[in-house]
């Protein structure tokens, strides 16, 4: 399968889940073509809310929808979501609202969008909040399974996605398990931990390290 950005995988998975779970609603802050929530918007226009460039209002509205029994996915660039950190903290985290925040354009690999759009501090900030789960899938397979897990999980979640295409690293029979690491390659000298968009690059780094003499050889 050709490389695919996890934001694209998210859009495809969300559109498919919309058929199965009718309580899913989606909100976006004028970036649906970039976050890929536009796929859901076109298929379910009555369950999609374009909030404009007003992330704070979007997050508060998502919290209200969650408290009313809906499953809201609120989407924007990761860097714009954390700019409304206090609203996330008070309206979502402290109330344990069942809101799914989706932050795209994570990390530095966002191409021509530039440094002002990079989500760099979001993992540290979102991990500090009570009740929140943070999920950063590494490829198409994991992303699609993670989106379904998130929809069924009760509680706030931050889903961190990439703009840049990623190669698949997980096998076709991969099964997503929250909080459980996956061993992609065995070895004995070096352990490399990675998450999200750098998993594939970490595997490449491991291949380069194999060319060096082992201390056990």
Walk through the language-model features, giving the residues of each.
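Short beta-strand elements in bilobed, periplasmic/extracellular small-molecule ligand-binding domains
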Residues: 214-217
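Glycine-/acidic-rich phosphate or pyrophosphate-binding loops and their flanking alpha/beta elements
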Residues: 5-19, 39-40, 145-156, 165-212
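Thiamine diphosphate
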Residues: 1-160, 165
């Amino acid at each position: 399968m050709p490389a695919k950005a996890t934001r694209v995988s998210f859009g495809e998975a969300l559109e498919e889940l919309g058929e199965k779970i009718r309580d899913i609603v989606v909100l976006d802050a004028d970036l649906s073509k970039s976050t890929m929530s536009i796929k859901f918007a076109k298929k379910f226009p009555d369950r999609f809310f374009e909030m404009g460039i007003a992330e704070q209002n979007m997050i508060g509205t998502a919290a209200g929808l969650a408290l009313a029994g809906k499953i809201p996915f609120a989407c924007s660039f990761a860097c714009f979501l954390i700019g409304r950190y206090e609203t996330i903290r008070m309206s979502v985290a402290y109330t344990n609202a069942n809101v799914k925040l989706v932050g795209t354009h994570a990390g530095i690999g966002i191409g021509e969008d530039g440094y002002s759009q990079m989500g760099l501090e979001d993992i540290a900030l979102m991990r500090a909040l009570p009740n929140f789960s943070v999920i950063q899938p590494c490829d198409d397979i994991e992303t699609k399974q993670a989106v379904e897990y998130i929809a069924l999980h009760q509680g706030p979640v931050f889903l961190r996605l990439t703009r840049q295409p990623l190669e698949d690293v997980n096998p076709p029979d991969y099964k997503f398990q929250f909080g459980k690491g996956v061993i992609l390659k065995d070895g004995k000298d070096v352990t490399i931990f990675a998450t999200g968009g750098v998993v594939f690059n970490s595997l490449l780094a491991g291949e380069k390290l194999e060319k060096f003499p082992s201390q056990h050889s």
